[in-house]
């Protein structure tokens, strides 16, 4: 097989799988690891893939849009979603609030509530809510991501697992056509799973741009949540998953 054909084949595999390891490519193309590494380096130089130690992924599915850009997009939609979610949270509730700009919008919408107890791994959420003297804000320990104020890591997982709260407000980077929830950071996925496991009622908050958006880490099925809050009807295939699993859908 010529190098050009192999390069095209690598790109196609990465598109299909989101991420592909060097070992898989060696076996698939029956060439040496050194040949595959050279191929990946050349494709990465052309910005056709993003090179990882041990493999490669699509640039669009490997690196999230910068936080400031995400914060400035779909703002009206996020505010509508946030207001609807806030209406469902009684005063005096306990809740987790996740990393993400839509969960941050929910935090803003909760400022008129009273006596909430909130556990969060999002520094921006804590900064928003700390003005409320009657709120109890519990900030998870762990590694702080300076790019978006998220807190992740083993310490975060251990911390979240100590609690059992009324609500979990969850964001996500992408939702595949089969209802798979997708993220860019494996550590963040583990934290989200911990929030799901330790919440009595999980609310997924997503604007319409997240449907069909790719990311390389599969967190699991949308059937893990109890309700989905979004601003437009999901694709038919996702709607079918929601219906099959009796997941509440709120269009905001």
From Swiss-Prot:
HTH deoR-type domain location is: 3-58
What residue ranges carry the coiled-coil annotation? none
Residue intervals annotated as DNA-binding region are 20-39
Q: Which PROSITE patterns match?
A: HTH_DEOR_1, HTH_DEOR_2
What keyword terms does UniProt attach to this protein? DNA-binding, Glycerol metabolism, Repressor, Transcription, Transcription regulation
What would be an example GO MF term here?
A: ligand-modulated transcription factor activity
Read off the NCBIfam families from this record.
Answer: PRK10906.1
Q: What is this protein called?
A: Glycerol-3-phosphate regulon repressor
Provenance organism: Escherichia coli (strain K12)
């Amino acid at each position: 097989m010529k190098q050009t054909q192999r390069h095209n084949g690598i790109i196609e595999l990465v598109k299909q799988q989101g991420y592909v390891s060097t070992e898989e490519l060696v076996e698939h193309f029956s060439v040496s690891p050194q040949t595959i590494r050279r191929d990946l380096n050349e494709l990465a130089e052309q910005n056709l893939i993003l090179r990882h130690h041990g493999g490669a992924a699509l640039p669009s599915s490997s690196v999230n849009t910068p936080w400031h850009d995400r914060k400035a997009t779909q703002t009206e939609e996020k505010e509508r979603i946030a207001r609807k979610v806030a209406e469902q949270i009684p005063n005096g509730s306990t809740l987790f609030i996740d990393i993400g700009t839509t969960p941050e919008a929910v935090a803003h919408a909760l400022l008129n509530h009273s006596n909430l107890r909130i556990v969060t791994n999002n520094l921006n959420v804590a900064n928003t809510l700390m003005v409320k003297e009657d709120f109890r804000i519990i900030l998870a320990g762990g590694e702080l991501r300076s790019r978006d104020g998220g807190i992740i890591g083993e310490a975060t997982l251990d911390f979240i697992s100590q609690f059992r709260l009324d609500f979990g407000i969850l964001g996500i980077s992408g939702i595949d056509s089969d209802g798979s929830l997708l993220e860019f950071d494996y550590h963040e996925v583990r934290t989200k799973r911990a929030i799901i496991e330790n919440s009595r009622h999980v609310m997924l908050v997503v604007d319409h741009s997240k449907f069909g958006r790719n990311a390389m880490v599969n967190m699991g099925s949308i059937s893990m949540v109890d309700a989905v809050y979004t601003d437009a009807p999901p694709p038919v295939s996702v709607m079918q998953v929601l219906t099959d699993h009796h997941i509440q859908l709120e269009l905001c």
